[in-house]
A protein has these predicted regions:
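Extreme N-terminal basic, low-complexity initiation segments
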Residues: 3-6
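ABC ATP-binding cassette signature C-motif
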Residues: 8, 13-15, 19-290, 365-626
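Short, charged, amphipathic alpha-helical segments
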Residues: 153-157, 321-328
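Intracellular alpha-helical coupling/juxtamembrane segments of multi-pass membrane proteins
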Residues: 283-311, 327-341
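Short E/K-rich amphipathic alpha-helical oligomerization segments
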Residues: 307-313, 617-620
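Short intracellular "coupling" helices and adjacent cytoplasmic loop segments at the cytosolic face
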Residues: 312-324, 342
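Amphipathic heptad-repeat alpha-helical coiled-coil/stalk segments that mediate oligomerization
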Residues: 327, 344-383
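Proline-centered turn/helix-capping motifs that create local helix->coil transitions or kinks
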Residues: 337-348, 447
Length: 626
């Protein structure tokens, strides 16, 4: 036994010496390889049977870039990510170079926690490091009795390289450091099964950052994260030393992370080196330039149209071959001018036209029902509240909910017609549960006004749609007379005709949310219950939804972690605190979030950007560019 221990220690010493010499000779090669790191696409084209996704797109990702990948829902962002991860699974034109040392990390939108995996957070994050350590020890054990060491030495070197590449010698301290950055430093001994969904998502991000430090792809890692966890995700992203490619529509992350932007629209891709705020300024400049070019194009088109009309008139009076040739040439030129009208795939974006309507009943028709306002655009939230005073549509009194523990306890609040209210708080505090119970209206602690028409947007799309059926089939009960009407209606929500014949289960998360909004719009409800309505939605659709909510004359109760939507649309907030709901003004809510999470310089820059956007918007409407 003692002799075996000596042999093993001797073998480990030999391995260490061999590894040291090999590692020293390889250091130059590793530096060269580091310089080679890249993801590069050159004139890449790819199509689905019903849609062109990419038309000769090109981009490059190199060392230590933190890149945001943006674009409207359904443009093919997730497909491009999958092409990078599994290029051999796709038939495409052009070139796609994936030259990344080591494993490519991937954080999915969704993770299913193995309920039977009773391990602590620390042990879960240690798994890959422990596996490699055990493999190294096994090789050393085999060396103690092996006659030939060359193959074992190669195996040892390979495993040791993997271990060193992920900083394995310091993995325990690195785990604790990452947990601290994510504000989870007290969680290392917690069981995975006891974590909330947001906490588990952060653990997944930490895990990938530790075992795939060179390059990580994240597909909407922010979905359903509460604001504290979103801020933790921001800190993890900003502290990471490797390259990141992150699909996100989250405006908080976009405004506070990333030094490169990839923007995919209309089968084309634009690459921008700089921050998201800088990119938005560039888009505004592009919009002005496009407007000026479009004005010049229209002037030239109009001039040639008049020439064509004159030549046609002359041709009817005089039968001349010369006149005929001149007319034909001018018509051809006019067609070319029409075809080449200045377009920009990153400015001319087909945006959703979200509209929300009430049943338009007067307040006399139903006791406690929504008042019949006629001009929401000119009515402030304060005026709405005053007009609807004492028209209570919802009363919640001593509402409690518990699962394995008490979540909400004796919650009491009420809402009046026309009010727009957000429930805000950490994950796992019962927000979705109370919203669902209000919709079901079968809890004695909840009272809705008689005959109030209520619509509900769920996080779980399967609660609303039969996902195995087509989009068209799911809208047959929405009050349309023909399939053609359904197609035309859904086009206003960004759905091209071919998508209408797809099964709902094949749509992206953002498209499913758009579909729910389209269906809710047809219901003409007086009271909207919206559970995370901006999740998965692209930024353009988020803004369209905000405008629709502002114009909507009915009442809204919304669960959301999106600061911008809450701050821009709501009258006040119900903040989850100590199992109660505390009423908070929007001004106080803004101040609380700004103080804790927003950089002052960013806020000043954002304000300047808004002022510039407003000036440009007015100039575009007036046609003035001075």
């Amino acid at each position: 036994m003692e002799e075996s221990g000596k042999m093993r220690r001797c073998c480990q010493d030999i391995c260490a010496l061999w590894h040291y010499e090999s590692y020293a000779t390889m250091s130059g090669e590793n530096k060269k390889r580091k310089e080679k790191f890249m993801i590069k696409a050159e004139k890449l084209s790819y199509s689905f049977p019903q849609k062109d996704l990419y038309n000769k797109i090109s981009f490059t990702l190199e060392d230590d870039v933190h890149c945001a990948f943006i674009g409207t829902n359904g443009t093919g962002k997730s497909t491009l990510v999958d092409m990078i991860l599994h290029p051999d699974n796709y038939l495409y034109d052009g070139r796609l170079i994936v030259d990344v040392p080591g494993r490519i990390g991937y954080v999915s939108q969704f993770y299913s926690l193995d309920e039977e995996k009773e391990v602590t957070v620390f042990d879960y994050l240690s798994e890959e490091f422990v596996r490699l350590q055990n493999e190294i020890n096994t090789i050393c054990d085999e060396m103690a009795t092996a006659d030939e060491l060359d193959e074992l030495m190669d195996r040892y070197q390979n495993v040791m390289d993997q271990f060193q590449a992920i900083d394995g010698d310091f993995y325990e301290s690195n785990i604790r450091k990452q947990l601290k950055i994510a504000n989870l430093k007290d969680y290392e001994n917690h069981l995975l099964t006891n974590l909330s969904g947001g906490e588990f998502k952060l653990i997944q991000v930490i895990r990938e950052m530790m075992i795939s430090p060179k390059f990580i792809i994240m597909d909407e890692p922010d979905v359903f994260l509460d604001f504290e966890h979103l801020n933790a995700l921001k800190n993890l992203i900003n502290s990471h030393k490797g390259t990141l490619l992150v699909i996100t529509h989250n405006r908080y992350l976009l405004n506070h992370c990333f030094n490169k932007i990839l923007h995919l629209e209309n089968a084309e891709l634009q690459e921008f080196d700089g921050t998201y705020v800088d990119y938005n300024f560039a888009l505004l400049e592009m919009k002005i330039e496009q407007q000026e070019l479009a004005a010049a194009d229209m002037e030239e088109i109009e001039r040639n149209r008049k020439i064509v009309e004159r030549l046609r008139n002359e041709a009817t009076k005089v039968d001349s071959a010369t006149k005929g040739r001149s007319l034909k040439a001018r018509v051809s030129l006019l067609e070319r001018l029409e075809a080449r009208k200045t377009k920009s795939p990153f400015v001319d974006i087909k945006q959703s036209q979200i509209e929300l309507h009430t049943s338009a009943k007067s307040s006399d028709d139903v006791q406690g029902d929504v008042s019949g306002q006629t001009d929401a655009d000119e009515t402030t939230s304060e005026e709405r509240t005053e007009q609807n005073h004492e028209k209570v549509i919802l009363e919640v009194e001593n509402y409690s909910v518990a699962f394995d523990r008490q979540i909400m306890e004796e919650v009491t609040f009420s809402m009046e017609a026309g009010e727009k209210v957000a429930i805000v708080g950490p994950n796992g505090t019962g927000k979705t549960t109370i919203l669902r119970d209000i919709y079901k209206n079968n809890n004695p602690a909840i009272k809705l006004a008689p005959d109030l028409k209520v619509a509900y947007l769920s996080q779980m799309h399967g609660e609303v749609f039969d996902e195995r059926e087509t989009v068209l089939k799911n809208f047959e009960d929405a009050g349309f007379e023909t399939d053609a009407e359904i197609v035309r209606y859904l086009e206003t929500y960004g759905f091209e005709e071919e998508l209408v014949y797809n099964k709902v289960e094949n749509l992206s998360g953002g498209e499913k949310n758009q579909l729910q909004l389209a269906k809710i719009s047809r219901m003409d409800a007086d009271f909207l219950l919206l559970d995370e309505p901006t999740s998965h939605l692209d930024t353009y659709s988020q803004l369209a939804l905000e405008q629709a909510i502002e114009k909507y004359e009915g009442a809204v109760l919304m669960v959301s972690h999106d600061f911008y939507t809450v701050a821009n649309c709501m009258d006040y907030v119900l903040f989850v605190e100590e199992k109660k709901l505390r009423k908070m003004s929007i001004r106080k809510f803004r101040k609380m979030i700004y103080a804790d999470h927003f950089d002052k310089n960013y806020l000043e820059l954002e304000q300047k950007k808004k002022e510039l956007e407003n000036r440009i918007s007015f100039a575009l409407q007036a046609g003035k560019f001075e």
